[in-house]
Amino acid sequence: MSDGDGGGEQGGGGPAEAEESALVLGRLLDRGAWRLKVAGVEKPRRDARLLAGHVLGLSPGAVLLADDRVVTPEEAQALEAVIARRETREPVSRILGHRGFWRFDLALGADTLDPRPDTETLVEAGLAVLEGCGGRILDLGTGSGCILLALLADRPGAIGLGIDIAPGAVRVALRNARALGLERRALFAVGDWAAAVAGPFDLIVSNPPYIPSADIAALEPEVARFDPSRALDGGADGLDPYRILAAQVPALLAPAGVLAVEFGQGQARDVAGLLEVGGLCPYEIKKDLSGEERCLLARRRAAGPLPPIHIDAKPSAPGNGPTKA
């Protein structure tokens, strides 16, 4: 339905008809999408529909078929409120309070990073490490628990510990574990990286902050304003967390254990170098679906020279089910 001029009163209708026309969902979506477009939102129509579905309790498909639906004044007011929030560039996932990741719908909080589809590359790499076995998993900087919970869901014999410095993030991760029925195999605790953790672990995973401090202000508003800064800020060069991991992880890995870490664009060689200095042997780099180098795997160093790092020729395959917007 287009914005148009309405036309209701010109056809002889009275004030009641005009008021009803103003509450037709299609018209509200047109106006909402226009406002979001002006605000610089990348996909204004899609986001307006998602928000309408949230307010009205409708699936995205049902919203597409509901242009002629007349909403109540209360529903129109609620839709106006969430459109106004999205106008500020608050992400839809933050407004809804949840985000699709792997094949789950996970709760978010003010202290958790909004999980990205690219991070599913890290999950796929971890699952390959644990192929055919259980294992003990440590997730450093767990946030919403998305990585650890995805690994545990697909490796029923595994158990895991997630650490985050933010108590609010730990509470969200616990909530997600309970919602997925994984609370018996997933423990979460507040901690400063692995400072108070005892190993050994068969797999250690981390998606640490890796944005250089000076670059954060230039990120999309959805990220710079609404993701917690401590989940983004990797220090002056974006590599401070990897220095911590390089110092702490070797002592926590089992003899055949593996560290899998996510990193930012152009950071692969620097991250590999830091891990080598810490006593690890980086052996493989995984690419995400867009073809960007995204994930590095390293193991405890054996005697002798370091072998060359293998780089995937192709991006990793999609995970178990599409990532939901």
UniProtKB/Swiss-Prot annotation:
Catalysed reactions, semicolon-separated: L-glutaminyl-[peptide chain release factor] + S-adenosyl-L-methionine = N(5)-methyl-L-glutaminyl-[peptide chain release factor] + S-adenosyl-L-homocysteine + H(+)
Keyword entries, A-Z: Methyltransferase, S-adenosyl-L-methionine, Transferase
GO biological-process terms attached to the record: methylation
Keyword Cell membrane: no
Region ranges (Disordered): 306-325
A Pfam family per the record: MTS
InterPro entries: DNA_methylase_N6_adenine_CS, HemK-like, N5-glutamine_MTase, PrmC_N, RF_methyltr_PrmC, SAM-dependent_MTases_sf, Small_mtfrase_dom
Domain of life where this protein originates: Bacteria
Binding residue positions for substrate: N207, P208, P209, Y210
GO molecular-function terms, A-Z: nucleic acid binding; protein-(glutamine-N5) methyltransferase activity; protein-glutamine N-methyltransferase activity
EC number: 2.1.1.297
Residues holding S-adenosyl-L-methionine: G141, T142, G143, S144, G145, D164, W193, N207
Function: Methylates the class 1 translation termination release factors RF1/PrfA and RF2/PrfB on the glutamine residue of the universally conserved GGQ motif.
Protein family membership: Belongs to the protein N5-glutamine methyltransferase family. PrmC subfamily.
Protein known as: Release factor glutamine methyltransferase
Taxonomic source organism: Rhodospirillum rubrum (strain ATCC 11170 / ATH 1.1.1 / DSM 467 / LMG 4362 / NCIMB 8255 / S1)
Taxonomic placement: Bacteria, Pseudomonadati, Pseudomonadota, Alphaproteobacteria, Rhodospirillales
